[in-house]
């Protein structure tokens, strides 16, 4: 038998699986194929890779579960997320399409369009959906401008006779707002049915009727989430507060700073025989005599 030193043996750089490699097990010299040696050496590495892959799969699944609500395409999910993205200078056909479909893809609370110098901000999705004496079945986006469009009186004198529907604001002073909004969104402005007060007795709203609405002042519930100054039941006198706007707009719930724009603006609620509810420029809830020239900051829906 010829004996050679290891350094004298011909070296190979690409061993085949069948090559034999000497190995000592502590009792004597043995041989192991290169394939078996490679498999044994890689066992802990393969185990680590398998464990890592399983963990990654679990982590990805967890992340997907957490992210999923952010991409659900329905009003409920989109009403729960404030984003505040600039959507452009006009309502696009693509945006209108997803609104009509009720999926609201890539539209979230706080997103806005800047049209004709006015910032029109998304305040809610499907807020009036399924409401009205004639059911609203049109998917829609509620819009509220960031700033007051202009100033106007509720009435020429400090009276609330006829409530909101009987006011100068409703009959005349909202006309400019309707024109401005129509110029910005055209025939996308939605007409839907709401209940509005039309009579007052001793400072209480005492009557109302279902009307078709396109552009109207907000009520306290839409802004604050509850009534603040408008009259409620005394046990013997029950106001005609049969409104469909029973909950706060998501815009104001998710980002309360949007309630105040540092300009006072009217709400449509009768507070007394002389005044209507008001959001004061300092951010506090308030009311004022109807003859004050206050801000007009209406809400409306587009589809």
List PLM regions with ranges.
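Heptad-repeat coiled-coil amphipathic alpha-helices that mediate oligomerization/assembly
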Residues: 41-74
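Generic N-terminal leader/processing signal
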Residues: 2-3, 28, 44, 53, ...
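A detector of low-complexity, intrinsically disordered, Ser/Thr/Gly/Pro/Ala-rich segments
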Residues: 1, 5, 31, 47-51, ...
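Extracellular repetitive beta-rich solenoid segments
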Residues: 2-44
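Collagenous Gly-X-Y triple-helix signature in extracellular proteins
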Residues: 68-303
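Enrichment for repetitive, rod-forming helical segments
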Residues: 37, 45-47, 62, 185, ...
